Regions:
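N-terminal ordered "arm"
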Residues: 1-58, 62
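A structural signal for short, hydrophobic beta-strand segments that form beta-sheets
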Residues: 1-12, 32, 137-140, 205, ...
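Short amphipathic beta-strand and strand-loop transition segments with alternating hydrophobic
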Residues: 6-11, 131-146, 192-196
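Small/flexible residues
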Residues: 19, 33, 37, 115-117, ...
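Exposed beta-sheet edge/beta-hairpin loop segments within beta-rich domains
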Residues: 53, 141-144, 180-181
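OB-fold/S1-family single-stranded nucleic acid-binding modules
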Residues: 55-58, 63-133, 148, 153-176, ...
């Protein structure tokens, strides 16, 4: 099915990428999922747009199925859609003003106020409420390296804090590794990881979905 998507995430996943955005016809999130990889990560041959990486705010026509995987290994996500064969085509770009209508403002980010959520919490909800992607307006962003990886602490305009979440936005990681300055206010695409259990002796919650900074759009974009 031909689907026009505002790209709001191009992030690291299993050595490849996770792409996500808003279906402009429905206003709903979609996450294209490959049929040819073990965890749905999208290889370059499927995600490329005229030989280039999809960029945040690109308007892209994608061929997506009506359905996708929704099981435990995908954190029971409602947004997943299988990728069908037609190549993706960019035909323009959205502005920051265009995406504001899609901002989430609930008092929890992705089902909890902590940096993770148990998949069972999502599974217990109707499919229409099993969100694993959100766009949030951020009034303060801090980024630091820990264990060789970039971590983000952010405060939304609603006053919700998320501390020490992993940064998976590929472009932002490149900027940080290059020593570039980043704007500390903007719009964050927040996503849930595939469930995994941290190697901690006192951890007793099993595999959980971890919140990720999957896309960062500076306020001045």
């Amino acid at each position: 099915m031909e689907t026009t998507v505002i790209c709001l995430a191009n992030s690291k996943k299993e050595g490849e990428r996770c792409i996500a955005g808003i279906d402009v016809r429905t206003g709903q999130w979609v996450r294209p999922v490959s049929r040819h990889t073990s965890k749905g990560e999208v290889p370059f041959r499927e995600r490329q747009v005229a030989g280039q990486e999809p960029q945040l705010l690109d308007l892209i026509v994608m061929d997506l199925a009506h359905e996708g995987p929704t099981g435990f290994e995908y954190c029971h996500a409602k947004e997943n859609r299988w990728i069908d064969p037609s190549p993706w085509i960019k035909f323009g770009a959205a502005s920051v003003a265009d995406i504001r209508r899609y901002l989430a403002c609930d008092n929890q980010i992705l089902h909890s106020r902590s940096k993770y959520v148990c998949p069972g919490v999502i599974e217990a909800k109707p499919l229409s409420l099993r969100s694993t992607l959100e766009l949030r307006e951020v009034r303060a962003l801090q980024l630091e390296q820990a264990g060789g990886k970039w971590k983000a602490t952010l405060t939304t305009t609603e006053g919700i804090d998320l501390r020490g979440i992993s940064v998976t936005d590929c472009h932002l990681i490149e900027q940080l590794n290059g020593g570039w300055e980043f704007l500390k206010t903007g719009y964050a695409t927040l996503s849930l990881s595939i469930p995994w259990e941290p190697p901690m002796q006192d951890w007793d919650e099993g595999p959980v979905g971890w919140k990720l900074l999957a896309g960062w759009i500076p306020a001045q974009s």
